[in-house]
């Protein structure tokens, strides 16, 4: 497992030693790696990974950040409602693309979200991390926090639409693991083409015509 946070998300983690460890770190991006298997296998992978990252200027923080992430990885979603009640907009979205397109996509979606949210006069915090990695590419997971302005659902719809347009414009998938749902329906043709939509409609009509 590899999770790589961008500078903004890492900065949030730097605010507490419970997440980052005791070492004094002033910037950069936090990478968390976890391996499964026999003790010999996992130690070998950890040793190889540490060597690769160290050779490129990385600093090992030990096991504490990974253990903190494992312990609290499912806690963050429960903060959403509390933040909404406190007057903050908090939402997430995700996408995926090839390695060669990853940095361009990340910059485009970050800019789209930031512009859409700050245009209403509120500050916005847009965080991103790589959540899944593959031989050919990776998934980008964005977390957005901003002050509420008017109808919060409409505020997010505008930001989400801007992000989706950036995703489509940069030839990425409209969703990696959150699935399609009604939120992504407007971009289904961009995602799978006219033929793909026709196939889905034919299957629906045949198996579930009601």
Regions found by a protein language model. Give the residues of each.
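Short acidic/histidine-rich active-site segments
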Residues: 173-180
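Activity-critical C-terminal alpha-helical subdomain
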Residues: 181-210
């Amino acid at each position: 497992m590899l999770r790589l946070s961008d500078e903004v998300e890492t900065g949030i983690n730097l605010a507490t030693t419970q997440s980052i460890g005791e070492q004094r770190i002033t910037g950069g991006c936090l990478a968390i790696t976890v391996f499964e298997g026999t003790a010999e296998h996992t130690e070998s992978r950890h040793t190889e990974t540490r060597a690769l990252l160290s050779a490129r200027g990385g600093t090992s923080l030990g096991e504490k950040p990974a253990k903190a992430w494992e312990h609290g990885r499912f806690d963050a979603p429960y903060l959403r409602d509390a933040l909404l009640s406190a007057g903050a907009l908090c939402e997430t979205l995700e996408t995926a693309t090839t390695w060669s397109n990853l940095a361009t996509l990340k910059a485009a979606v970050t800019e789209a979200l930031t512009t859409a949210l700050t245009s209403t006069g509120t500050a916005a915090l847009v965080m991103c991390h790589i959540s899944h990695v593959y031989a050919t590419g990776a998934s980008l997971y964005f977390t957005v926090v901003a002050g509420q302005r008017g109808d919060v659902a409409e505020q997010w719809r505008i930001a989400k639409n801007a992000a989706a347009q950036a995703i489509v414009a940069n030839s990425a998938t409209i969703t990696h693991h959150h699935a399609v749902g009604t939120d992504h329906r407007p971009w289904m043709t961009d995602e799978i083409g006219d033929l793909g939509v026709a196939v889905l409609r034919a299957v629906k009509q045949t198996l579930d015509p009601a």
